[in-house]
Amino acid sequence: MTLRARGARLLGGLLFFTLLAAGAAPLSWDLPEPRSRAGKIRVHPRGNLWATGHFMGKKSLEPPNPSLLGTTHHISLRDQRLQLSHDLLRILLQKKALGLSLSGPASHTPYRRLLVQTLEK
């Protein structure tokens, strides 16, 4: 083979290899981003939790309203006694309606009688 044939064959192989490599490469020419400090930030898959709770609450520039600070109802001692007496009256009326004795601790006397009668048989 002559020198000219070898050169043509080498040139053809090189051209074939170039076309093969160009076909395997992506069709768009993506230029790499310039290296800067922004490119060196590590991103964690779960996200960066550094400032998670920083902006959680509402930030307000106005001073808080004093009427909103005391939103809990302060019940006086007299109101508490009145509420307790109403609750006691309601409980006593329920016990009377059910036929339970009003004196003494709440016992299961009607059920106890039934249980004793059942066990004696």
Swiss-Prot record:
Signal peptide: 1-24
A UniProt-annotated Pfam family: Bombesin
PROSITE patterns reported in the protein's UniProt record: BOMBESIN
Keywords on record: Amidation, Cell projection, Cleavage on pair of basic residues, Immunity, Innate immunity, Secreted, Signal
Any one GO molecular function term: neuromedin B receptor binding
Tissues and organs where the protein is expressed, per its UniProt entry: Higher expression in the central nervous system (CNS) than in peripheral tissues. Highest levels are found in the olfactory bulb. Relatively high levels in the CNS (including the cerebral cortex, cerebellum, spinal cord, medulla oblongata, midbrain, hypothalamus, hippocampus, and hypophysis) and in peripheral tissues such as the pancreas, adrenal gland, testis, ovary and cecum. Moderate levels are found in the rectum, heart and pons with low expression levels detected in the bone marrow and duodenum. Other tissues show no or low levels of expression.
GO BP terms, alphabetized: antiviral innate immune response; Leydig cell proliferation; negative regulation of interleukin-6 production; neuropeptide signaling pathway; positive regulation of hormone secretion; positive regulation of interferon-alpha production; positive regulation of osteoclast proliferation; positive regulation of respiratory gaseous exchange
Function: Stimulates smooth muscle contraction. Induces sighing by acting directly on the pre-Botzinger complex, a cluster of several thousand neurons in the ventrolateral medulla responsible for inspiration during respiratory activity. Contributes to the induction of sneezing following exposure to chemical irritants or allergens which causes release of NMB by nasal sensory neurons and activation of NMBR-expressing neurons in the sneeze-evoking region of the brainstem. These in turn activate neurons of the caudal ventral respiratory group, giving rise to the sneezing response.
Record-stated family: Belongs to the bombesin/neuromedin-B/ranatensin family.
Stated name of the protein: Neuromedin-B
Highest classification ranks of the organism: Eukaryota, Metazoa, Chordata, Craniata, Vertebrata
